[in-house]
Amino acid sequence: KLSMVSFMINRFKNIEIKKVLIILVIILFAFSALFSLSSNDKIAILEIEGVIKNPKQYLESMRDISEDDSIKGLIVRIDSPGGTVGSSQEIHESLIKLSNKMPTVASIVDIGASGGYLIACGTSHIFANSGSITGSIGVISQYYNFSKLIKFLKFDIETIKSGQMKDIGDSSKALTNEEKRLLNSLVKDIHNQFKLSVSKTRGLTDEEINEVSDGRIFSGNQALEMKLIDKIGGLEEAIIYIEGIIQLPNLDLEYFPKKEEKLLDGIIPAIDNSSLLNMLNKKLYYLYSPKF
């Protein structure tokens, strides 16, 4: 009887030991999986550089970032004087949507002006260096008048149009007073759209936005005083800020757009920019464009 009891006790112990071992294995596996996931977490850095004429590569990058569950935050690294109105607005709106999913921060390098600044306003927090150039909240549109040159060269240009305003901005003739009035109205409307976007995202009063929206530029220090940015700092400060929000330190960084995309998209505009037609296209710009 004693041997039977001893056998049962030993068997019970073996069963309990097995259970404990199984539980330990499960716990270790869970911790290993958790550690693996956390070690793969990262911050995306979206680099926006140069004059913005086509938002495609940036929109595609933001879609990739949004669909990647390992990306816990986004830093938009801006070094741009702005660009075309529609492109700047598309990127701005896409960033606002992305900000609802993850923390987003803008980091202005040398310049984040006009459309570049509008893009920064699509994020939840804006950093700039003390000497960065920003602001330039305005609209510009330039039309070339080659009518005197055409007359000198004795060229004849015949235009057949369906309406009085169909050839507005045609470089072969000067703008009429009515055309100037129409274009001024257009610029004013788009300028008001810019002001509304900035005042809404930055929480500015009508008086505050009117004070900074005449097209003037600001240094980072001045922009901080005018509530156009949140803090003075560069990429490191932006990373620390994001990590503080998501409570995950020392995250990996993944840069967008990918290098092959940037190379391809850089070649095509370079070819396009060599064309005389590019100089003559009729577009409105959120662009800081000093004549040096």
Predicted regions and their residues:
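N-terminal organellar transit peptides
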Residues: L2-A106, D110-S114, T123-N129, Q142-F292
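Short, charged, surface-exposed secondary-structure boundary motifs
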Residues: I137-I140
